[in-house]
Amino acid sequence: SDKDDERCTVVILDSVTDPHNVGAILRSADQFGASLVILPERHSANKVNENDVIQRSSAGAASWVPVSVVTNLSRCVEKLKESGFWVYGADAGGVSVADDMFAKKTVLVMGSEGTGISRLLKQQCDSIVSIPTCGKIDSLNVSVATGVLLYEIYRQSVNCT
């Protein structure tokens, strides 16, 4: 059916505790058509509707982008995989997004800036992707990296339809 052909992008934020980053990610999620942002109950800036910083940094997107707070990210990823999603983890050592074609049903897992994606979640990923850069520090802010990856998923879907 047509519904099966539609692109669906889910963003999972693993231990992203800075509300500025969460807000900026919600803004990118809105701009590039992500269907849902999932945050863990613990170790996360997840009070989206009550946090003024998230509200301001999202430029209003926090009101539009569906957000789900879950107790267990690993179980959540398993359920998404069972529903036919392909899970991509973002990590500096991954395959360049320039060389990867994202699946129609995509989960994008973003880790904290300090520690990255937790070991267990990383093991659950079907692919690990990275953004090719040319800087000396080989590192992007998590909200910027999420925006770049969401744009690439969006760009591929526009080119494929």
Per-range role (PLM):
Residues L26, K81-S83, F102, S112, ...:
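Surface-exposed beta-strand edges and their flanking turn/coil or helix-capping segments
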Residues S1-V95:
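RNA substrate-binding interface of SAM-dependent RNA methyltransferases
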Residues D30-Q31, Q55-A61, R119-T161:
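Structured adenosyl-cofactor binding patch, chiefly the S-adenosyl-L-methionine
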